[in-house]
Design a protein with these regions (language model features):
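Accessory carbohydrate-recognition regions in carbohydrate-active enzymes
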Residues: 22-358, 362-405, 411-469, 477, ...
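Extracellular attachment/recognition segments
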Residues: 706
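Bacterial Sec-dependent N-terminal signal peptides
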Residues: 1-23
Length: 761
């Protein structure tokens, strides 16, 4: 064959291959199973495969765990007990308003242990918009496609004289009614783990595409054939059909926290679409949301990790509002039990998500956060407090008053379509009050903090240093928010002063944050390796850096940049030793730090996640670049063990998303993002204002983690931060990456990011 003929043949083959090659879209890179290989003693995410819409009210998940078990799906499990509508934000908070369904064949079985079927991941498809599993014991294929408040299920049965569909409304008080003339099952569940009013119910409705050949209800485990109503502790229903092999049953399901009638209204989200149309709709929605960040890379594994993290970043906070028959936005209040107008969101802990999840929304999805801010206005009106951990109402979890950060950063980022004055009232109120039944809401110890400048170690308020540090940052947030609102200097002065209260728990002898007694002395004995006690799920090596708004002030306390950098280095150099005596056992966060071989750096928990970026304040940004790449490549992947600790409702995922883009919000509310180094060759951020941010990294091989040079908008750029204004105007970044650090770049005083102590009063 001549060279010309050979070349023509190669081109023809390439053309054929190109014609048949699959075109990948963002959602195709997502694995919803990332983080699901978790257990109580060791978290690799503590996630479940949420089949859902972005910020949807209802999620669906296959269920491997027992009813009420926070570990609802674990990758290592062999059997599925059902398919659950869930509202669970984490296994530690657990679920509410949940119920399950399960197809089966043969004699009807309700007990979840007995009805469970073997399944295999080889016959499982798990995407954000579609889930499929093969129930081997029944020869049944079950598929799910969701909308925000509804879902459609398609069940492919074998030939069976009695093919059944189980509806399990769970225990703690439930109700089910079969409506044969309408091919429907309706009911409600009251199951929850706290944070709900007494009248809480999740009403559900299931509409089948054919008449029932068999009906029964379940009363506390007893199947009552032919009966139509069950109201008891643990209610359920089983409806049956005669099926041919390959026959498909379609079930349309919706729910409401308002009423059964509203659940029927929510069923209209499905319209007249069949299963495949709903599935296609969901796929488009996910591609629209994920496609706001466009990534080009030769590394499929990194693309899978990135988009799997972005998927987790847009699940929570959960929508908790509905549209009534008039098309009005309404919600059942998880705070006072009334049905009221307006938005409501839930299932997020601000202790986690103030750090970078909400800042990500403010960059990429600000219109969603405007709705969330309106929801916070309603939460305050209905309960007298802003939530700190909501699921669905106030929950007693974590510390701090970080709703102030959520509110301030949104407003300072230009979000305005809500009642900001009411939120000002709310954040100020939270500085001088504690919720009467949920002490983690408001400020526990505010009397001491406002008088002494810290929460003392010896007044029976635990995690006191953590509280002091977070209250100080929150006061800074309130100060900035108030300035933007035009509040008087007199009104703002207490917050300005208290923003420096972090100084009051800094021990110059150890250069670490340390518990302080009411009389002013520091606690004795003191171990920087002791977890808990004065800190929250961390130790002094972790919390010393929780001065988000004033790293320069912390540098000054330590005696300068050299000591500051040595202390930062020490976090990685100190062996992963620990003192767990406060807990009396090794909690999973400790174990996750211990096994990662990064010294005392604990990326699996939130308090220290910003720490790597602090080298940019102290003139050694190349260390940020090195440790960012180490953390991204070692602590994250797209497998079931893909996280190095709890994913925490988008926070740990949003860290990866920001870091991959090459910048991170160390101090939400400052209007600045600290630079690291991008992970991908090219990224384009499609902003809601119509502008685009372009990020290009030349010579971006795996070993080239250091920034040799950076150009911003065509000009050399040495600063270690970028402003929000730069981003919103459509910034263009061009990096030249290298395998050796450039120790001349980013070292000038003017290159350092924002610090409060550098601002003139």
């Amino acid at each position: 064959m001549s060279k010309r003929k050979l070349f023509t043949a190669v081109l023809a083959l390439a053309s054929v291959c190109a014609g048949t090659a699959k075109t990948y879209e963002p959602v195709d890179y997502v694995s919803t199973l990332v983080g699901s290989e978790s257990k109580h003693s060791l978290s690799t995410g503590n996630t479940y495969p949420a089949v859902a819409m972005p910020w949807g009210m209802n999620f669906w998940t296959p269920q491997t765990g027992k009813m009420g078990d926070g570990w609802t799906y674990t990758y290592s499990a062999d059997k599925l007990r059902g398919f659950k509508q869930t509202h669970q934000p984490s296994p530690w908070i657990n679920d509410y308003g949940q119920f399950a369904v399960m197809p089966e064949v043969g004699a009807p079985v309700f007990d979840e242990e007995k009805r469970a079927s073997w399944f295999s991941h080889k016959a499982e498809v798990a995407t954000p918009y579609y889930y499929r599993a093969y129930l081997a014991d029944y020869d049944i294929v079950t598929e799910i496609a969701p909308t925000e408040r509804a879902a459609i299920m398609r069940v492919t049965y074998p030939e069976a004289e009695q093919a059944s569909f189980v509806v399990d409304a769970y225990d703690d008080g439930s109700y089910v009614k079969v409506l044969p003339e309408q091919n429907m099952v309706v009911g409600y569940t009251t199951k929850n783990n706290g944070g709900v009013p007494e009248n809480f119910k999740n009403y559900f409705v299931l509409k089948f595409d054919r008449p029932f050949a068999y009906t029964s209800v379940v009363v506390n485990g007893e199947i009552k054939s032919g009966e139509l109503v069950s109201q008891c502790n643990h209610a359920g229903a089983i409806v049956g059909f005669k099926t041919k092999r390959g026959e498909q049953l379609n079930v349309r399901i919706a729910s409401s926290f308002i009423s059964e009638e509203q659940a029927v209204e929510n069923l209209k989200e499905l319209g007249n679409d069949d299963f495949d149309a709903v599935k296609a709709r969901g796929r488009k929605t996910w591609n629209d949301v994920l496609g706001k960040i466009e990534v080009k890379s030769h590394d499929i594994d990194h693309l899978r990790t990135f988009y799997s993290c972005l998927y987790r970043s847009v699940l929570f906070p959960r929508s908790f509002y509905e549209k009534n028959v008039q098309g009005e936005i309404v919600h059942y209040s998880p705070y006072n039990g009334e049905v009221l107008p307006g938005y409501m969101f839930t299932d997020t802990g601000f202790w986690d998500t103030f750090r970078c999840l909400f800042p990500l929304l403010n960059v990429m999805y600000p219109s969603m956060n405007e709705k969330m801010q309106a929801g916070l206005v309603n939460a305050y009106k209905e309960s007298g407090f802003l939530p700190e951990w909501a699921s669905p109402g106030h929950r007693g979890c974590m510390v701090g008053n970080n709703s102030a950060s959520i509110v301030a950063d949104a407003y300072l980022c230009g979000l305005k379509n809500y009642d900001a004055e009411k939120l000002w009232e709310a954040v100020v109120h939270g500085t001088k009050a504690v919720h009467p039944t949920v002490s983690s809401t408001g400020r526990l110890g505010y009397e001491y903090y406002n008088k002494l400048g810290y929460v003392p170690y010896d007044v029976k308020i635990n995690e006191n240093v953590a509280r002091t540090l977070e209250y100080a940052y929150d006061d800074w947030c309130i100060y900035q928010f108030g300035k933007q609102l035009g509040k008087s200097k007199k009104e703002l002065e207490p917050f300005r002063k208290r923003a420096f209260n972090y100084r009051n728990v800094f021990d110059k002898e150890t250069n670490l944050m340390r518990g302080r007694l009411k009389n002013g002395e520091f606690q004795k004995p003191f171990s920087p390796l002791k977890w808990g006690d004065a800190f929250t799920e961390g130790n002094a090596w972790h919390y010393t850096w929780s001065v988000f708004h004033d790293p320069q002030g912390l540098i000054d306390l330590m005696g300068g940049k050299q000591v500051f950098n040595q202390m930062l280095d020490s976090v990685f150099n100190v062996p992963p030793l620990f003192d767990d005596s406060y807990y009396g056992a090794v909690i999973h966060e400790i174990r996750e730090m211990q096994i990662m071989n990064m010294g005392n750096y604990a990326h699996g928990n939130q308090p220290v996640q910003h720490m790597i970026y602090l080298y940019g304040y102290s003139g050694e940004p190349w260390k940020t670049q090195y440790w960012i790449r180490q953390t991204m490549d070692r602590m994250y992947n797209a497998n079931p063990d893909g996280y190095c600790g709890d994913e925490d409702n988008g926070q740990t995922s949003a860290w990866y998303v920001f870091s991959a883009m090459g910048f991170y919000p160390v101090c939400p509310g400052s209007g600045e993002y600290v630079l690291g180094a991008p992970r991908f060759d090219e990224m384009t951020l499609h902003l809601e204002n119509g502008k685009s941010v372009s990020i290009k990294a030349c010579n971006n091989e795996d070993e080239n983690c250091y920034v040799k040079t950076l150009q911003l908008n065509g000009a050399p750029y040495t600063k270690n931060y970028v402003t929000r204004t730069d981003l919103m105007n459509g910034a263009q970044f061009v990096y030249d990456m290298a395998s050796e650090p450039n120790k001349q770049r980013g070292t000038a005083e003017s290159d350092a990011p924002y610090s409060f102590s550098k601002v003139k009063k």
